Amino acid sequence: MNKRGNNNKMIFKTPQHLGLLCSTFIFSFFFSTAIWAVPNASPASTDNLKVYLEQIIGPDDYRNYKNIQQLQRVSAWIKEQMHLFGIPCEYQNYAVNGLSYRNVVCRLTNGHADKVIVGAHYDVFGEQQGADDNASGVAGVIETARILVQQKSQLAQNIEFVFYTLQEAPFFKTEQMGSFIHAKSIQSQKDQIQGVYILEMIGYFDENLVQEYPAGLKWVYPQHGNFIAAVSNLQSYALGSQYCQSMRALDRLECQRFIAPAFVSGMEFSDHLNYWKFGIPAMMITDTGSFRNKHYHSKTDTLKTLNLAKMANVVDGLVYSLLTPIQP
């Protein structure tokens, strides 16, 4: 049990770029206080990201596979927040060991045949807040959606936002992962899927630490931990290339590309792996996770360790990339 306390009072916040609707919204018996963001066309906002992170992390129990009530709380909040942006969502329900789990699938459509998928997992490993892993990724997807809904007419494809359950152990690399369930469900549409962008830990940066890498890569890439990484296989080369080009165009945060097959350790450490299995191009946007973040899978993975300004840079790069036609 998290002992941070539970404040049931109505809370009001007013970020610079975005008005916030704050309400007491009851989801069954488990969700008593919620904060909502109202859509407004603007660059990624650190204030919004903080609100999302606080709501995802929550005040009480941890959102691991044993605490289904917490997983339901988070998925219900995500669905309602996206609804307030004008993006309809549905649950993708499935059972594991007789228990019910669900992805949240949200669609921003504008009449195109092709689509791009943007996703992140919302569960955690064990008993910890999981601020970087992976509340940061979920917050990034939500903020991306907020911006894109205001620029819908500029999109050259539909966008499907997916929030996955059961990415963490003991389900990682099994067919019970939420991303495996989703990837399998869309395999017949793969010719219409331009690519999948997975946000996996996007909030930890430290220019003073010595960055670690999978074997053989430390001589090629920077020693500092102050960049965002675009991880892809050869099939997904164009996705990673375009994302880093977008980051370079914005010129706010360094972007490094990693291109390798799934058998190279570290390249497969998230939900993009399941799309590769079905021949769907996919990439991971990440701060490199356990290769950088000393708080990985520990109780010290908290909100105060995140760099919200650089998270916002990561989101702006993704928005820029999604508004630019993918170059093969």
Question: Which stretches of residues belong to each language-model region?
Answer:
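Acidic/histidine-rich catalytic neighborhood of metal-dependent amide-processing enzymes
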Residues: 125-239, 267
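Extracytoplasmic/secreted proteins, especially bacterial periplasmic and envelope-associated proteins
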Residues: 48-55, 69, 73-84, 136, ...
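A non-catalytic alpha/beta surface segment that caps or lines the substrate-entry region
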Residues: 51-111, 258
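Second-shell loop/turn segments in exported
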Residues: 39-43, 60-69, 94, 125-134, ...
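Bacterial N-terminal signal peptides that target proteins for export
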Residues: 8-23
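Active-site-adjacent substrate-binding region
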Residues: 195, 206-328
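N-terminal capping segment at the start of a domain
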Residues: 36-73, 85, 123, 292-301
